[in-house]
């Protein structure tokens, strides 16, 4: 059981503190629980809140936005998310999920996959389409010499080359594959990141295996298919990757000193100095060119800034003209993910 929370005036039941999965559909601007047998079925015209309480009070709160949901419903979902997050002591890491571009973490909650139904809460339509498989399957390329970065790639052998390292994350098994011409810094980074994913995202329960080119285990072959001849690695590409990795991210400070949420760029290339993250403020880490925006919430930031995190992220996506389905991850201080930490110098 999680720490008890006050319930006076809340639209959510006391059971929100219970471990496990909780799903609500936003109906007439209110959260309505989704029965367990219907969890994994989502109406394209609606918005949902999905809360997962894991071990050791690790919580993730997802806002799922249907492709045909109204702005009113999306707004109500965001308001309810703020309320629920506050109710839980601002403990959860928050995620914005858009239909068809859900995160692997979100997909992992639904072992039978997702099903999309046309229409909305009051719709009579029941046409169903199946979402992607639920199991976590992710491939990262680890590349660079100085600004080494892990970037998600397509899950096939075409993404591989002999000059880099790759992390194949299959949930309970995490493989760090090292090309024959990869440099020692990439190999160390791949190992460290695989271990960090195990420890912070799987509570230490996943198996990490370091794989040498040519010694791939059967599980890798089962997921990726028969291994073809791989592209040769080019050491000069590491220097190009250093520059690209540095320029692919920027850091902004969020301030409401003028009564409106304003963003001030504090760094235009990574890796960033860890000292830039100040507990009194909130920050936007822009990795939108790679499909994701992060909001970091300092534990001493004022309440208005913390509660406006999702609104700030959506406004930023619009301002930068990123794709509407750009993923958003909102991280309370102390709950940073390994992928977020890699944008900073010497963050272990």
Curated annotation (Swiss-Prot):
Function noted in UniProt: Calcium-sensitive protein which reversibly blocks the barbed ends of actin filaments but does not sever preformed actin filaments. May play an important role in macrophage function. May play a role in regulating cytoplasmic and/or nuclear structures through potential interactions with actin. May bind DNA.
GO molecular function: actin filament binding; cadherin binding; phosphatidylinositol-4,5-bisphosphate binding; protein domain specific binding; protein-containing complex binding
InterPro entries (alphabetical): ADF-H/Gelsolin-like_dom_sf (IPR029006), Gelsolin-like_dom (IPR007123), Villin/Gelsolin (IPR007122)
Family the UniProt entry places it in: Belongs to the villin/gelsolin family.
Record-listed Phosphoserine modification sites: 337
One Pfam family, short name: Gelsolin
Gene: CAPG
GO cellular component: actin cytoskeleton; centriole; chromosome; cytoplasm; extracellular exosome; F-actin capping protein complex; Flemming body; intracellular membrane-bounded organelle
Keyword Cytoplasm: yes
Alphabetical list of Gene3D superfamilies matching this protein: Severin (3.40.20.10)
Motif interval(s): Nuclear localization signal: 137-146
Record localization: Nucleus; Cytoplasm; Melanosome; Cell projection, Lamellipodium
Protein name, per record: Macrophage-capping protein
PTM summary: The N-terminus is blocked.
Subunit text: Interacts with NUP62. Interacts with NUTF2 and RAN; involved in CAPG nuclear import.
Organism, as annotated: Homo sapiens (Human)
Residues that bear N-acetylmethionine: 1
GO terms of biological process kind: actin filament severing; actin polymerization or depolymerization; barbed-end actin filament capping; cell projection assembly; central nervous system development; protein-containing complex assembly
